[in-house]
């Protein structure tokens, strides 16, 4: 029995299947962890969702910002952008089934035995694990309820960007969503910066990557995350695993086998299904 952690798939179905074949993933015996952003940008979002859903208890995933955006498009709140290549999924006969399954997926995965935590963007240093659990449950409860379109309509925005237990209502839910699915940089006090997307070396002072600011979760648990392709899987402290290596941008899809910490990569097919110039310009 092995545990395989894979970074953001972004609709790159062929690469996902090739990578799983490479590591000899066996559903029912092995477990697959996925860092979120299953969909958008790659050509196979529909196939990715169908496959991941079919794995049942053999998969543990978290929602990413692109997954939430897909749900907002599905609910008629956001516009379907051609660059996301979501139309085949939205028009599929099983779209309702797939997307109602997707909105019931978690924002946070925890394995106490492995001392492993996974969230799409990471864990804000302002939270301990109990707070992270409670916050994840708050958003998950709304997403799985009949009122989920109301939340999706209100989730867009960058404020509030500083955690307080006193946060209430939609502001609280928006902060939680941003922390779990959009966070990259923080100010030294842990306050979120929602604007900078560059590599840590290029970020303006005093911003730091969230994982460079001491927090209680990282003291006791390993943290796996995706979301930040420009890290290229590098530059994180021991016990922090950055798994998004930009497959949908022409990079690779990365897998970490947890038991021996061995990495496996599958090169992107992006240059094969579009012109080199377009891929380079993305």
Swiss-Prot record:
User: Reaction catalysed by this chain?
Assistant: P(1),P(4)-bis(5'-adenosyl) tetraphosphate + H2O = 2 ADP + 2 H(+)
Kindly give the PANTHER family that the UniProt entry links to this protein: CYTOCHROME C5, PTHR40942
Keyword Hydrolase present in the record's keywords: the answer is yes
What cystine pairs are annotated? Answer: none
Q: Which family does it belong to?
A: Belongs to the Ap4A hydrolase family.
Name the Enzyme Commission number(s) assigned to this protein.
3.6.1.41
Task: List the gene name.
Answer: apaH
Broad enzyme group: hydrolase
Gene3D superfamilies cross-referenced by the UniProt entry: 3.60.21.10
Q: What does this protein do?
A: Hydrolyzes diadenosine 5',5'''-P1,P4-tetraphosphate to yield ADP.
List the molecular function annotations (GO) for this entry: bis(5'-nucleosyl)-tetraphosphatase (symmetrical) activity
Organism in which the protein naturally occurs: Escherichia coli (strain SMS-3-5 / SECEC)
What highest taxon heads this organism's lineage?
Bacteria
Q: Which HAMAP family match?
A: ApaH (MF_00199)
Keywords on record: Hydrolase
The name under which this protein is listed is: Bis(5'-nucleosyl)-tetraphosphatase, symmetrical
Q: Which InterPro entries match?
A: ApaH, Calcineurin-like_PHP_ApaH, Metallo-depent_PP-like
Pfam families given for it? Answer: Metallophos
């Amino acid at each position: 029995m092995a545990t395989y952690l894979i970074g953001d798939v972004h609709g790159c179905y062929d690469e996902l299947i090739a990578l799983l074949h490479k590591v000899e993933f066996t559903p029912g015996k092995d477990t697959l962890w996925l860092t979120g952003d299953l969909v958008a940008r790659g050509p196979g979002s529909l196939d990715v969702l169908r496959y991941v859903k079919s794995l049942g208890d053999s998969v543990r995933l978290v929602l990413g910002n692109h997954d939430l955006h897909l749900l907002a498009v599905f609910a008629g709140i956001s516009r379907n952008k051609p660059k996301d290549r979501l139309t085949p999924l939205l028009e599929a006969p099983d779209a309702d089934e797939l997307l109602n399954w997707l909105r019931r997926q978690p924002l946070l995965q925890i394995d106490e035995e492995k001392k492993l935590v996974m969230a799409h963007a990471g864990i804000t240093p302002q939270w301990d694990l109990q707070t992270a659990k409670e916050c994840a449950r708050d958003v998950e409860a709304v997403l799985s309820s009949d009122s989920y379109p109301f939340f999706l309509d209100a989730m867009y925005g960058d404020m509030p960007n500083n955690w307080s237990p006193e946060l209430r209502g939609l502001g609280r839910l928006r902060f939680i969503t941003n922390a779990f699915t959009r966070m990259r940089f923080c100010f030294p006090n842990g306050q979120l910066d929602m604007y900078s997307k560059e590599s840590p070396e290029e970020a303006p002072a005093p911003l730091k990557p969230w994982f460079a600011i001491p927090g209680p979760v990282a003291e006791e648990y390993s943290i796996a995350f995706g979301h930040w392709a420009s890290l290229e899987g590098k530059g994180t402290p021991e016990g922090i695993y950055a798994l998004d290596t930009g497959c949908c941008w022409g990079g690779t899809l990365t897998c970490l086998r947890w038991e021996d910490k061995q990495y496996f990569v599958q090169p992107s097919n992006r240059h094969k299904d579009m012109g080199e110039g377009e891929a380079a310009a993305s």
